[in-house]
Amino acid sequence: MENTQKTVTVPTGPLGYVYACRVEDLDLEEISFLAARSTDSDLALLPLMRNLTVEKTFTSSLAVVSGARTTGLAGAGITLKLTTSHFYPSVFVFHGGKHVLPSSAAPNLTRACNAARERFGFSRCQGPPVDGAVETTGAEICTRLGLEPENTILYLVVTALFKEAVFMCNVFLHYGGLDIVHINHGDVIRIPLFPVQLFMPDVNRLVPDPFNTHHRSIGEGFVYPTPFYNTGLCHLIHDCVIAPMAVALRVRNVTAVARGAAHLAFDENHEGAVLPPDITYTYFQSSSSGTTTARGARRNDVNSTSKPSPSGGFERRLASIMAADTALHAEVIFNTGIYEETPTDIKEWPMFIGMEGTLPRLNALGSYTARVAGVIGAMVFSPNSALYLTEVEDSGMTEAKDGGPGPSFNRFYQFAGPHLAANPQTDRDGHVLSSQSTGSSNTEFSVDYLALICGFGAPLLARLLFYLERCDAGAFTGGHGDALKYVTGTFDSEIPCSLCEKHTRPVCAHTTVHRLRQRMPRFGQATRQPIGVFGTMNSQYSDCDPLGNYAPYLILRKPGDQTEAAKATMQDTYRATLERLFIDLEQERLLDRGAPCSSEGLSSVIVDHPTFRRILDTLRARIEQTTTQFMKVLVETRDYKIREGLSEATHSMALTFDPYSGAFCPITNFLVKRTHLAVVQDLALSQCHCVFYGQQVEGRNFRNQFQPVLRRRFVDLFNGGFISTRSITVTLSEGPVSAPNPTLGQDAPAGRTFDGDLARVSVEVIRDIRVKNRVVFSGNCTNLSEAARARLVGLASAYQRQEKRVDMLHGALGFLLKQFHGLLFPRGMPPNSKSPNPQWFWTLLQRNQMPADKLTHEEITTIAAVKRFTEEYAAINFINLPPTCIGELAQFYMANLILKYCDHSQYLINTLTSIITGARRPRDPSSVLHWIRKDVTSAADIETQAKALLEKTENLPELWTTAFTSTHLVRAAMNQRPMVVLGISISKYHGAAGNNRVFQAGNWSGLNGGKNVCPLFTFDRTRRFIIACPRGGFICPVTGPSSGNRETTLSDQVRGIIVSGGAMVQLAIYATVVRAVGARAQHMAFDDWLSLTDDEFLARDLEELHDQIIQTLETPWTVEGALEAVKILDEKTTAGDGETPTNLAFNFDSCEPSHDTTSNVLNISGSNISGSTVPGLKRPPEDDELFDLSGIPIKHGNITMEMI
């Protein structure tokens, strides 16, 4: 735990409120963009936001009145029991939800959820959760408040700790304590909720029969209230909160989960098991009878060090339920936390600033939800996503290093098992129970799987479809079916669908899944994989520069030195030095720190050849000077071990556990909770074998006896490198506590003479999880097993630096050459072409096929400067990424210089890439089918209405789809405090010799699924990707495939064409795309070309080529016509290639900055050329020496390696 303990003062209050709002006082259009609601239900979820669903002064963290205790000699006095908590980030609309627009037009989602629930064997919410319940309807509440039921919306705002208590009817409405608050346009009535335990002194447990008015625990003289039970509200909490948790915990008895969580809320001292012993488990053939390979695949290897589990799956099932029980306890720890972050205020969102009118605000909101769809889709499309971790596997007993059996942290693990959910169920001993469910070998993704991961909640499923309907950009994986053709072609045929009719088929959930079927995950054998997690950056601090936390503050500061200010030490860190370099470049007008990924500002600086070369000289001088000074300070002043520090450097970032940072909508909050449950169970499962080791696990009392042991081992993992917590001392606001007077009942005003007593004064608050990635690959094979050594050898080949000639356009200055080609080389275009073409120009140059008379003296000088800069950079480069802007070039150049000073050699370093989600208007009719709202009567109507939607997108704020861009300036991307998706694998290990504490590391890993997850993903072991949806500048202010296989995709083909080069790369790419995509290529725009090429300038050229072909076609665009146009353009640009040149060819290989242009040409028509020489091929003179450095003086910087 942290040494510094913070004190926080919180107010006291009820466990929740019921808000009663008039419909006209709410911004229903904006609310609908953020809500979760299906078409067949009036129940809805809304985000907890100030000035949207709660008042501006809403207090999110408080001490909840959770019960009462008797005081005094005779027990006549009452002291209120107070428990810390924070409000749940979603609110529950249980009356009037019909006024909120559905999230998706997909019909009959409740039917789909019920069918999936029955198929997978999960319990339903049938009737009241307790006996003798008396319902309080929404209409009754409205009548009591003097409001019109038809014109009123009622929703519940409840604390995270007591939401299950509301479901179990252990609360009552205190009408005497209602008050009026102001939200948005009008006044809103809110009714506080208190627990019935307030009328049962000293009862610290869940009340199983709250409607029993003669309960013996009711205090003498107390007027017992009517507990609050509402059918719709209970269904909403059951389906959207408890059932998703039950799916993640592998517990099919959903009510048992609710009962256990509610009990823990009232009994803070309970440490034993809370889930019942009769839990059922999914039957499947465990692979622990075999052995575990390095990647987790099972094989029958007699030489393996793993042994089969002797218990026939009993220990696997025991580990599963004990890990689930531990996760419930962890949820209580999180729910009792006090967090400083408050719910966001929608009126303060930066993206709404300066906007007048409803349509612009809705357009901004629609655009941003399309951005969010990028990260939501990644969680759905990745097969190792936390959403799909529904089963536990046993990898078998692993022998210790001394040859004997020993406990292993890696024995039990979660894996993706939705395809197993329909299998029969077993009891704890493995006996198969009678069940209607049968397993199926079909692993094709279906709507049932979406319903499963949503906990069978129709509102969550509708909201998830809302995002999937916006996932369109970048699905260039081959075989992408045209959904429009599918719907129109099957309109008149009898296709059995339980969810839709003909006229609603375009918006059916099955149509959405069919459209995205190529991107949906496929599940198979149980293997250990990284966990795909969803989280939020709530801090602008991250170590995501190329060298991570190299030379950090904690190492540079001198222990015990009180004379030097901390700020002075900070200025000598790598992070601060890189920031100073960016400031210097900004002063030189080379960089805009507000938009470091953009190079548009260079257009005002680079106006001709001299300014271009001056930029290169300035850039090189600034970087070398800054790096030299930085290394000198580290060595001479800080006495920093530069080489050892490099081997210990890591990229790092923290994903917050703050409940409101990821609460943009109910689905983002849902994903945060699923991520928490996944990582908590991963840690708990790692300790199960240690608890089981040497014990008689078959005993009936084993679980109750050792559940507290597992819980304590889990809590001991806090602050061990992965989960960070902080101990907070809680104090109460001054004054008496306001609560209902038990002797007067629920209609009387609140009494204000009660004293309160906190159940826990010191609260452990879970803050964040830490993700790390080592910068340098060491290749050290010592102290490793044979399997690990073999895997490391395979990695070494991937990290091996390849010595090869650098293509200028793929080198350090490639982005500048593409951006300013038209300015620097206006004549650099193919014959019969009207626009300069950098690919054609530099291809001919590097093949020595460029006629010298086409180059001026200034152009030759610039070419020589570019060649020298590129080759000098390539000579020291250990980063397997070409820069795409000045900021990336600066940080890469500086990192390479530091690597040179540290004598780094042989291996490439690990690099980070951030995929930034964006938004665009749809252009393909197939991507707007789900927005057709008019009933269709024929197949022709579908296409007509789809095209009509595309013509009026500007007036339809919901018509946005996702797009992606990439940047290697990851720290700049993390400064926007984004919502992120990435893969992590949590390693566990003991400390130094004699230290039994278990430490962990959240290793930055990958998302399986490749380009199905994101079109910009590439298979490169040296790179780590993160998908980020920026929040800064939008909703918060900005201060200061399976792992072993890889499929060939269209993006791979395009990248292959780019790498192979060629004079007319654009034509080759365009033809390839048209052949692969077909008619969809007609609607492709800049975002699509960028997704394929990951090159902004090449994408712009392709967009222009696309427009040019459309204009030249005399008939409507067709695949055949486009390919014919490409062929004609190719013939025009290559015309004259067979002619024998009579002029001199420019010799690119021997070019150097020189005033004599004749030294850089080859005489290809003179007598020294043999008659068999093919015109245009490189034939250097015999006395030509490449890279003759004899006349170049050796430059010495201010510091050399000898000095170090």
UniProtKB/Swiss-Prot annotation:
- Family membership noted in the UniProt record: Belongs to the herpesviridae major DNA-binding protein family.
Could you tell me where this protein is found in the cell? Host nucleus
- Organism ancestry: Viruses, Duplodnaviria, Heunggongvirae, Peploviricota, Herviviricetes
GO CC annotations, alphabetized = host cell nucleus
Residues forming the motif Required for filament formation are 841-842, 1146-1148
UniProt entry tagged with the keyword Metal-binding: yes
Q: What protein is this chain from?
A: Major DNA-binding protein
Q: Which organism is it from?
A: Varicella-zoster virus (strain Dumas) (HHV-3)
Q: What GO MF annotations does this protein's record show?
A: DNA binding; single-stranded DNA binding; zinc ion binding
The family database entries (SUPFAM superfamilies) matched by this protein are listed as: Viral ssDNA binding protein (SSF118208)
